[in-house]
Amino acid sequence: MKQQNDTQILQFLLLGLSENTELQPLIYWLFFSMYLVTVWGNLIIILATVLDFRLHTAMYFFLCNLSFVDICLISTTIPKMLANVHLNHKAITYEGCIMQIYFFTLFVGLDNFLLAVMAYDRFVAICHPLRYTSIMTPHLCMSLVLVSWIASVLNSSLQSFLVLQLSFCTEVEIPHFFCELSMLVHLACSDTFLSDMAMNVLAALLGGGCLVGILYSYSKIVSSIQAISSAEGKYKAFSTCVSHLSVVSLFYCTLLGVYLSSAVTQNSHSTAATSLMYTVVTPMLNPFIYSLRNDNIKRALKNFVKKKLEK
């Protein structure tokens, strides 16, 4: 491992999910397939939303943004991992590692904010259906997404800046398939108090704040559904939330799993394996969760395919 001025490291080693050479071809093709499915699945959601004017509503606008962010999230980590596995090369440059941290933190934060915004959208749709169009105006929708971007950029910029202040004095091997913020901070040989404090405080404020907002929205939604007299009305109201609730549960449960796993051990492949759920699996499943349970998305896709076949 090369060093510069004995303090600034030039590169890190990403140990990946397994050091077993026999498993590398399987890992490569598995993740290559998952990457393609994720990108194409989310692109189809975006395409269906853009081409069908009936989907030009607040809910699908947020879903379109979520699909775009999921493509960016998985593209931040998986292409580099695939390149390393293919070339049998574990190194990532210092600059590349910082860039991964910045963009990964940015897009995970955006996922977090967008899920909260979508919960608010469902709250307005079910609790205030007659005022939905007057509340969820295009201006408000754009503002909510813009605020989400600004908050995420500020968060990732601060986290990356604090990492830049750290020194790495020895060979740094990261037991992960990408540069994960908390792992990198704990591998530093300089004082990590500010970085640790920023990670914990911002996770509590941003992540916890969004989760509280989601839980509050759904508490109101449940109360409103219970007030509906007919069973059919209750089912119809609840069915509009099932897809979003499934994605929220998957996202936050896997994040909790990563937190609990890292609390037990820092330098372990188990944490990397657990983080696969929200870094790869969740973005891959989101399009299927929304499209399989959403008649509007399925209709838009059928119409798109039909038009293509008729040409």
Swiss-Prot record:
The record ties this protein, via CDD domains, to: 7tmA_OR7-like
So which tissues is this one expressed in?
Tongue specific.
Q: Which GO terms describe its cellular component?
A: plasma membrane
Q: Which residues are glycosylated?
A: 5, 155
Which residues does the entry place in the Cytoplasmic compartment? Answer: 47-57, 119-133, 218-244, 293-311
Which segments cross the bilayer? 26-46, 58-78, 98-118, 134-154, 197-217, 245-265, 272-292
Native organism is: Rattus norvegicus
Location within or outside the cell: Cell membrane
Which membrane topology describes this protein?
A: Multi-pass membrane protein
What is the role of this chain?
Answer: Possible taste receptor.
**UniProt keywords, alphabetically:** Cell membrane, Disulfide bond, G-protein coupled receptor, Glycoprotein, Membrane, Olfaction, Receptor, Sensory transduction, Transducer, Transmembrane, Transmembrane helix
* Name this polypeptide is given: Olfactory receptor 1073
Topological domains annotated Extracellular: 1-25, 79-97, 155-196, 266-271
For this protein, the record's InterPro entries field holds: GPCR_Rhodpsn, GPCR_Rhodpsn_7TM, Olfact_rcpt
Alphabetical list of Pfam families matching this protein: 7tm_4
Biological process terms from the Gene Ontology for this record are: signal transduction
Its predominant location is: membrane
Q: Does the keyword Membrane apply?
A: yes
Q: Which gene underlies this protein? A: Olr1073
Cystine crosslinks: 97-179
Q: Which GO terms describe its molecular function?
A: G protein-coupled receptor activity; olfactory receptor activity
Homology family: Belongs to the G-protein coupled receptor 1 family.
> Would the keyword Coiled coil be found if you checked this record's keyword annotation?
no
